Amino acid sequence: MTIDAALAEQIRRTPKAELHVHIEGTLEPELIFRLAQRNQVALPYPSVEALRAAYAFTDLQSFLDIYYAGASVLLTEEDFFDMTMDYVKRAVADNVRHAEIFFDPQTHTARGVPIGVVIDGIADALAQARTEYDFSSSLILCFLRHLPEEDAFATLEAALPYRDRFVGVGLDSSERGNPPEKFARVFARARELGLHLVAHAGEEGPAQYVTDALDILKAQRIDHGVRAIDDPALVERLARERVALTVCPLSNVKLKVYPDLRDHPLKRMLDAGVVITLHSDDPAYFGGYMNANWEATFEALPLDAADAHKLARNSFEAAFLPAMQKAEFLAEVDHFWSSPPKSPPATAPAA
């Protein structure tokens, strides 16, 4: 399926919010090598090209293995700052106006990096991005679900001195053998602290994990959630309760959640009234930032301009933003889509 050139231009230019991106997953091979050299960290790859070739993982666990290896070069506030600014520049180029960014402190504290170094490095970059690029953002601290809940509790408590620098908690890493109920108590504690709650569920795990994330963890938003399509009653509930799913199509294909983007349930769930939003996940590893995900999805599925408008609106509707700022972004989206798309200039025929 070939996307209309005018629509392709519109989806590239529409204002968007990115609600599902792991900052460690934006580490491009070039930056990994640069930081490794700066910090004198030995890498098991002789070149940038060899590292990029290693990105040919086959499932979530093999991806996570290389993901954690790449993160080993992050040691100082400057490293976290540089990684974050690299992401911001790419996001701004894709017309991302607001981002709610995941970070995994346990990946770094396990290596002896203080949690303050992690949070301050990322948050300082985002503060500069707000001034330099008018880029709105917030941080969501994620717990690694393959580790014990006690580790999550310790991470949350260690992060409390930096409470003003993040807005919520999430749950990521391998779903298999790590159901939502494993983290019920730490999510209850986060809720007591007034933090927003999100959770990865229904990616490699079953639809029941989506239900459990809602009912046990009290998640306000579900990350991935595509396996909900296997449970029609759950799809109806998601639509009725306006629970947003932060869907990452290129990630789902790369990790073999679906064999082909044409098999992805995004369009079916959108048509069923679910608040679907479209994001990049770990773009350095999955071969696509926001616009690449949007373009590939529109090329693979029977989506039109009305769907694009809805997806852009949904991304801001689902964001943890103050009401006035959210209304301003939604007005910006609606104004953008109220104008008829302009076709790109035609290329002059060869003489």
From Swiss-Prot:
Binding positions for Zn(2+) per the UniProt entry: 20, 22, 200, 281
Comment on bound cofactor: Binds 1 zinc ion per subunit.
Function: Catalyzes the hydrolytic deamination of adenine to hypoxanthine. Plays an important role in the purine salvage pathway and in nitrogen catabolism.
Binding-site residues, substrate: 282
Annotated Gene3D superfamilies: Metal-dependent hydrolases
Broadest EC class assigned to this enzyme: hydrolase
UniProt protein name: Adenine deaminase
Family statement: Belongs to the metallo-dependent hydrolases superfamily. Adenosine and AMP deaminases family. Adenine deaminase type 2 subfamily.
Gene Ontology CC terms, in alphabetical order: cytosol
Keyword set includes Signal: no
InterPro entries named among the record's database cross-references: A_deaminase_dom (IPR001365), ADE (IPR028892), Ado/ade_deaminase (IPR006330), Metal_Hydrolase (IPR032466)
Needed co-factor(s): Zn(2+)
Pfam families xref list: A_deaminase
Coiled-coil segments: none
Keyword Acetylation: no
Gene Ontology molecular function: any one: adenine deaminase activity
Keywords from the UniProt entry: Hydrolase, Metal-binding, Nucleotide metabolism, Zinc
Reactions catalysed, as given in the entry: adenine + H2O + H(+) = hypoxanthine + NH4(+)
NCBIfam families: aden_deam, PRK09358.1-6
Native organism taxonomy: Bacteria, Pseudomonadati, Pseudomonadota, Betaproteobacteria, Burkholderiales
